[in-house]
Design a protein with these regions (language model features):
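A transmembrane-helix-recognition feature enriched in membrane-embedded lipid enzymes
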Residues: 1-56, 106-111
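Soluble catalytic domains of membrane acyltransferases
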Residues: 49-161
């Protein structure tokens, strides 16, 4: 890939992120849960396309009705969240440090990310209760039990908290 194409993709990605921040800040407070999910799904599809990722899903997977679920994922890239959201939007569990990241932390917080303070036993109970409530409310919740990214085909030890 040429340097020009790389810089154009990066510029499109930055603009896409800024547009997403604007939509979350200005539109999300007035949208229903279904409306927010549709926008997250569309935004994620566009982001994945900007990055040049091609996806292919099994037709039976696409045809499944959206239902409450707890999804356990192997984390291989920062794109994982967006790839998952292209099929069915989810709330994700993430380390609390992410909340402090400029722009990304705000975006995660306002799109329903559930933050956990690693190593704090009391926080595990709070997260558990939040997960149960989300699933009872009909949402899908996803998390990466390895707690970090790993090369494709590699499974790291799971973190209990």
């Amino acid at each position: 890939m040429s340097a020009v194409v790389t810089y154009l993709r990066l510029a499109r990605l930055i603009v896409h992120l800024l547009v997403g921040l604007g939509k979350v800040g200005l539109l999300f407070p007035f949208l229903s849960a279904v409306g927010r999910e549709a926008r997250v799904q569309r935004w994620s599809r566009q982001l994945v396309a900007i990055c040049g990722v091609r996806m292919r899903f099994d037709q039976t997977l696409q045809a499944q009705p959206v239902s409450p679920a707890l999804i356990i994922c192997n984390h291989i890239s920062w794109l994982d969240i967006f790839v998952i959201n292209t099929l069915h939007t989810c709330r994700f569990v993430a380390k609390s440090d992410i909340r402090g990241w400029p722009l990304i932390g705000w975006l995660c917080e306002h799109t329903g990310t559930i933050f956990i303070a690693r190593g704090r036993a009391r926080d595990v109970r709070r997260i558990y209760e939040g997960l149960v409530k989300s699933i009872h409310d009909g949402e899908r919740v996803a998390f990466f039990p390895e707690g970090t990214t790993a090369p494709q085909g590699t499974v790291l030890p799971f973190h209990a908290n």
